[in-house]
Amino acid sequence: MQRSPLEKANVFSKLFFSWTRPILKKGFRRRLELSDIYQIPSCNSADHLSEKLEREWDRELASKKKPKLINALRRCFFWRFVFHGIILYLGEVTKAVQPLLLGRIIASYDPDNKAERSIAIYLGIGLCLLFIVRTLLLHPAIFGLHHMGMQMRIALFSLIYKKTLKLSSRVLDKISTGQLISLLSNNLNKFDEGLALAHFVWIAPLQVVLLMGLLWDLLQASAFCGLAFLVVLALFQAWLGQMMMKYRERRAGKINERLVITSEMIDNIQSVKAYCWEEAMETMIENLRQTELKLTRKTAYVRYFNSSAFFFSGFFVVFLAVLPYALIKGIILRKIFTTISFCIVLRMAVTRQFPWAVQTWYDSLGAINKIQDFLQKEEYKTLEYNLTTTDVMMENITAFWDEGFGDLFIKVKQSNSDGKIPNGDHGLFFSNFSLLGTPVLKNISFKIEKGQLLAVAGSTGAGKTSLLMLIMGELEPSEGKIKHSGRISFCSQFSWIMPGTIKENIIFGVSYDEYRYRSVIKACQLEEEISKFAEKDNTILGEGGITLSGGQRARISLARAIYKDADLYLLDSPFGYLDVLTEKEIFESCVCKLMANKTRILITSKMEHLKKADKILILHEGSCYFYGAFSELQSLRPDFSSKLMGFDSFDQFSADRRSSILTETLRRFSIEGDAAVSWNEGKMQSFKQTGDFGERRKNSVLSPLNSNRKFSVVQKGQQQMNGIEENDDEPLERRLSLVPDSEQGEAILPRSNMINTGPTFQGRNRRQSVLNLMTRPSVHQGQGMYRTGNAAVRKMSMVPQSQLSEIDIYSRRLSRDSGMDISDEINEEDLKEWFFDDVENIPAVTTWNTYLRYITVHKSLIFVLIWCLVIFLVEVGASLVGLWVLKETSLKDKANTTNNTYAVIITNTSKYYLFYIYVGVADTFFALGLLRGLPLVHTLISVSKILHHKMLCSVLKAPMSTFSTLKAGGILNRFSKDIAILDDLLPLTIFDFVQLILIVVGALIVVSVLQPYIFLATVPVIIAFIMLRAYFLQTSQQLKQLESEARTPIFTHLVTSLKGLWTLRAFGRQPYFETLFHKALNLHTANWFLYMSTLRWFQMRIEIIFVTFFCIVTFISILTTGDGEGRVGILLTLAMNIMSTLQWAVNSSIDVDSLMRSVSRVFKFIDMPSEEPLPPKPTKSKKNQLSQVLIIENEHVKKENWPSGGQMTVKDLTAKYIDGGNAVLENISFSISSGQRVGLLGRTGSGKSTLLAAFLRLLNTQGDIQIDGVSWDSVPLQQWRKAFGVIPQKVFIFSGTFRKNLDPYGQWSDHELWKVADEVGLKSVIEQFPGKLDFVLVDAGCVLSHGHKQLICLARSVLSKAKILLLDEPSAHLDPITYQIIRRALKNAFADCTVILSEHRIEAMLECQRFLVIEESKVRQYESIQKLVTEKRLYGQAISHSDRMKLFPHRNSSRHKSRAKITALKEETEEEVQETRL
């Protein structure tokens, strides 16, 4: 970054913002880069500001029992705030003085007041000077207040972040990530936007008092008639604001429904295409869109009338103020024009400035109180350690995550005779109820000496991770003692990668030791992976390590923990994402050899690890089930395996037991309004559900940490359009709304871009507390259905290295992986996409082509615009005719002039006043929009409807290769933020711009006709305005975009820190991350400060141009007007009106250009390539001579009920994810017989899922695949995919009923659906729910276990009558019971079908008749598993002893003595950990 010219700027340069000229020139000539941005002044640095506020806050905490954050802010910023307020008031006072001089100038042209004619020129000079003084005072004052608001935001940002790193884990469980983001974005934005408005809470009343005093002098008591009208108008606007809130609340629920479905569709676009559900999803989303648009139009109309009320009030307030006085006493023309000028200022003060100020104070004080409450929450307490201690010891430890019993726990406990609830992920949603009010750890005691390995085992939710948290100090014991040295290293269960290089992630701030570093890399088997990267270990990893596979991330996390030299190493299931072979090698080389002399506590579920441990601790429901050596375990606890596997699943309970659990669980659903649950005498009577299934429940029953708080299946449709707040004490919408959100802020005030302003929605998954964020896997770590090698296509996103900037390393690492609009709760995987926006290939300024294309989307829009222009021409024409009539009348009056010196309202001169009434009435009709505004707003919303439909169709038809280059968040932003702009902001902004620009043009025409000389001044002014706007816009839009990009790292860094908070604390890296956060803040500040400064430069230049114009008009009017106070009055009044209106029009034009960028982005998506059927290959075969007709309607397919057998032939298949990318599979050929069951094997990332995707034509493929002799080139794409049944690894359950999820097209009867549900073992599950098939699933089927979701996918395949079934690792997250159900269903329902099963566990493939092994992009075939195991020893090592005995019975002796069977503990899977407590 360059040094800022501000540092060396003189007073005048600072006053006129001339120091910004270099960046404006640079931005006009070429595209700006981050390196062009100036460094921030030291007074704006986050370090300086945070230290200042933190010192005052600490002082406040120390001195008072009830500390107030506002006191700390007052001590930091009060006097500057007062100083700028006084300057702002002096600038506003000039507005009240201007009408006095205007009145004197008009009076000087009275025929009977020739004495003052000589001083008219001096009065004109005075009037011009007032405008100059106002310009010189207002702009520095407003900029100073914005600058101070920015500094307050920065200081509070830092304070909140530092507090977040100190929060206790208990508090983190009660705060969602969405609330933290809301705290840092919505609430703090109020300082940026509103501080300049805050002073009007006292300036506006003073203005009103001053103006009413001046009006009393003119009109006496009748002046209060105008004020009364304005007060009524303000109340009317407040009422309209409340009405709009109601519409918005209702509409927010509908938007939420649509966006939830859209989000689910985008996230699962592979599944949508695989199931051929494009039309079904389009229909569902469009139906929701229709309902939403009805409310959108109502909201727009209310906002339109609210906006219009300000315009039409001008005429009425003058009319009501003047008419009573004129009827009683008569009135002279001077008083009329003076009153008009006074009322313009009075109207702004009463209807705009004061309501805005009150709203600003209400919102700001509310934000300060929220931040104050947050800053006083309980902090993490560092335990006292003894550095000389070598042992690790616990004595009778008991600990709670959260005290207090919930009603649900009590009732569930009463319904269970032994008071114990099974603890695994084998039921619907009832796991861990027993942990609700009970200790997470009970009476735990153990002792391990230096150098020993303690293996901790237990079922999911037994308290294993809680044990490590206790040792780290994250969980405070309520009883007992802990003893260790305090020198700890920690490896989280779910790998955490910070933005940075591979080396930085491993070293993590510890001093670099080359030998140790190389040893750790080698032990963690990272050498080979690192060597493949072009930059080796200096390769930059995006947030979360998106470019790495799950196994690579796990190994880097493990390497980080081992590299640190510590006394005690806590390893929380570090091998969860490694294949069996890699896990075995790393355990040996790393845990057993490299760390042999260190004390280690390893959480594991593997029998091999237990055998090699010095001590074993097995936990069950928080208690010590066993502690000792492995030799003791076999003799003392022979049943430990079956006990901890948790076979007591939901499906094995009695019907009464299941009904009881389900009843109690559903009873906790907080259903609002008509979505209530009624229960009668313990039996489910009814369960009404509205269509608002998109409204997601707030909390998860599955998380016992959250289970004492209510959640809802269908929330009330309250939504905060501009935020993501959740507060139990107040509704999502603010309680006070004097002005609608779109109306807040004067036109000259910049809008902060710290958060997107589109409507937000509740995302795809259940509410995430911060603790859940830390204790659940990153979404990257799920093995996606379609992935390849190291380039995981996760959410269709990749981060090309070439996109990374060269300036701010940390910021560039953070900013590239983010995006997505979510509402009141934002989920962890959505946060990184929350602030992302796709801006590539979008020009800095909206092109004329975009405007033209937008206008021609809807034919009616062209006619409406022509209609608006016709009405405008009629108005201007009528005004000119009126002027001509008045002029003619005036000439006649001069010839018959009388000695009447008392110009009452019925005099000839009052004809000018009648003309003003005429113009006012015309403007009133214009403002009301009876002929112009409403049709325009209505048509623009229709345009938005069409664009949404076109974009939805385009996205659904786009090939998967397109999605591999787009982010899910970027796509969803088009449907959320950009469509919201098209719905809400753009119609009203275009209306305002059209209205304002026509008012200005009309006024200019009238002024020019009244005084033709003025027209000569008008032309250069208009040219100067157009050139200046074009000059500024080119730079400002680029600065705005750079600011938007710089905003991303702030929030991404917060989420990254939260995800790795336990690791940060264990390594003591909080100061380092605070420094990185300040760096991200400073980067954003540099962009935002420069944008504010250039905007003020532009606003000031615009005002200087029109002050010049007003001076010219004033002097021309004074010098060329003879006897005729009417004409000079009209000229000067209209010129002053132009002054106040034109700047508003200029800002509206900039807003329109900025909002039209959303239209550009939407058009970019509409223009995406379409997924087309592959062209047929030229061949001599008769069946392929139908050319294009063959693709549309294949006769062979139609007549023979294709496919009839399911025989597949693959010839020379090559698959790539993107055009020009590396081939994942190359020249693969094999054949599969009809009805054969084929196993697909390979290590993680070898291409198993890729091959399944290639079968479905989801990738860029070459070669040929035939089904029953029919080539894929000769079959329509949809029909080809319908030949396959699919059970993807990433299960797709969308928000809707069971019926919709099974049969979205509504093709099957209830009898068929129940029959299939029974076949796959779903019937008993569905019957438990009220409404049965019509029960609405929300939040991706959150009330179902992963196994039940897999069964739904299986049922879809059965209903599809497919002859070929593709299964992508179906056993990955299943409990044994559900897996047995799937195996049974496969045998029965798909007995005569071809089954292709992708697995990396050989145990799951014992029943396959044939095997395909993928290695190095090639496929090898094996006819039997015995042959596979014999030839591939690596796979043989992965088979358990019991399975080996089944495969090779001849090798086993019957003379072996039987002994107690010991099997491995059930592996904890990603889904289980998500749905259970620590």
From Swiss-Prot:
Annotated transmembrane regions? 78-98, 123-146, 196-216, 223-243, 299-319, 340-358, 861-881, 918-938, 990-1010, 1013-1033, 1095-1115, 1130-1150
What UniProt keywords apply to this chain's record, in alphabetical order? ATP-binding, Cell membrane, Chloride, Chloride channel, Endoplasmic reticulum, Endosome, Glycoprotein, Ion channel, Ion transport, Isomerase, Isopeptide bond, Lipoprotein, Membrane, Nucleotide-binding, Nucleus, Palmitate, Phosphoprotein, Repeat, Transmembrane, Transmembrane helix, Transport, Ubl conjugation
Biased-composition ranges, Acidic residues, are 1468-1478
- Cross-link (Glycyl lysine isopeptide (Lys-Gly) (interchain with G-Cter in ubiquitin)), chain numbering: K688
Q: What class of enzyme is it?
A: isomerase
- What does the record give as the reaction this protein catalyses? ATP + H2O + closed Cl(-) channel = ADP + phosphate + open Cl(-) channel; chloride(in) = chloride(out); hydrogencarbonate(in) = hydrogencarbonate(out); ATP + H2O = ADP + phosphate + H(+)
Residues modified by glycosylation: N896, N899, N908
Q: Name one GO cellular component term.
A: chloride channel complex
Cytoplasmic topological domain: 1-77, 147-195, 244-298, 359-860, 939-989, 1034-1094, 1151-1478
The subunit field of the Swiss-Prot or TrEMBL record says: Monomer; does not require oligomerization for channel activity. May form oligomers in the membrane. Interacts with SLC26A3, SLC26A6 and NHERF1. Interacts with SHANK2. Interacts with MYO6. Interacts (via C-terminus) with GOPC (via PDZ domain); this promotes CFTR internalization and thereby decreases channel activity. Interacts with SLC4A7 through NHERF1. Found in a complex with MYO5B and RAB11A. Interacts with ANO1. Interacts with SLC26A8. Interacts with AHCYL1; the interaction increases CFTR activity. Interacts with CSE1L.
Its name, as the record gives it, is Cystic fibrosis transmembrane conductance regulator
**Organism of this sequence:** Trichosurus vulpecula (Brush-tailed possum)
